A protein has these predicted regions:
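N-terminal accessory segment detector
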Residues: 18-155, 160-173, 181, 192-193, ...
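Low-complexity, intrinsically disordered Gly/Pro/Thr-rich segments
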Residues: 187-191
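Beta-rich nucleic-acid/ligand-interaction surfaces
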Residues: 196-207
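Sterically constrained small-residue positions within well-ordered secondary structures
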Residues: 6-9, 147, 195
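N-terminal chloroplast transit peptides
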Residues: 1-24
Length: 244
């Protein structure tokens, strides 16, 4: 029965002629030289995306205890920034993990028995393109990673959270690290997320074990030069300078 449910996903994933994955980019050694341009992407959501954002934001409020009167996507970013100011990077990652786990429901346990199947990375990549747009914007399927023609890759063309949030700490501690941990521990599927802090692209590679964060060449040290929290002198600013 479960395989019958997954059949449309598998057929779609296997039939695609996938473009190559984006190669990881080694950023400047110091993130302070990176200044993101002003956000330009229009956050117009479909009814489904609006409903998903509402559910995500409600869970964010429940797990962080932070509430903003600002509506929609930007209100959610305001809540996450406020939580960052007062909590350690570990607390930020733990809160994000709880948010994602609560929204995933029973699906990780349903998927986990099939995590070792050759089609599993492609199936997760396909699902990601259908259900993640409300949070990050436009996505497209790619090969798993540069030089690997298998399916299982997703390119976030311009991550809305990074573009509008402008914070490396938000990207790493409340998205990249908890997402990689959640898929490995709960779904039984490794995934490597490789953000590009100059273009706001992010390459997801399902079925690829991420390197230790201190060895990840895609992550510069320090705060982005355009980070709003760095400009404001947030109390927890120093925590953003480290990856652990």
């Amino acid at each position: 029965m479960r395989l019958a449910v997954l059949a449309p996903l598998l057929a779609t994933a296997s039939a695609c002629r996938l473009p190559a994955a984006v190669s990881p980019v080694r950023p400047p050694s110091s993130a302070s030289s990176i200044r993101l341009p002003p956000a330009t992407t229009d956050r117009t959501l479909s009814p489904l995306e609006a409903a998903l954002l509402l559910a995500f934001r409600w869970q964010t409020q429940q797990q962080t205890g932070v509430h903003s009167d600002e509506p929609g996507f930007h209100g959610m970013l305001s809540e996450l920034r406020e939580y960052q100011r007062e909590h350690t990077t570990q607390e930020q990652a733990d809160a994000s993990l709880r948010i994602m786990a609560s929204l995933a429901g029973p699906f990780p346990s349903l998927f986990r028995p099939f995590a070792g199947e050759p089609w599993a990375p492609s199936a997760l990549a396909w699902c990601t393109t259908k259900f993640l747009g409300f949070l990050v914007g436009a996505t497209r399927l790619t090969q798993r990673r540069a030089g690997d023609p298998r399916g299982g890759g997703v390119l976030v063309e311009k991550c809305a959270v990074l573009e509008h949030g402008g914070c490396k700490g938000l990207c790493i501690h409340m998205c990249k690290l908890p997402t990689e941990r959640m898929f490995a521990e709960q779904w039984g599927m490794p995934v490597h997320m490789a953000p590009n802090f100059e273009t706001c692209e992010c390459q997801l590679s399902f079925g690829v074990v991420p390197p230790p964060v201190e060895e990840d060449a895609t992550l510069p040290t320090g705060c982005l030069g355009s980070c709003p929290l760095a400009r404001d002198g947030a109390p927890s600013l120093d925590a953003f300078r480290d990856f652990t």
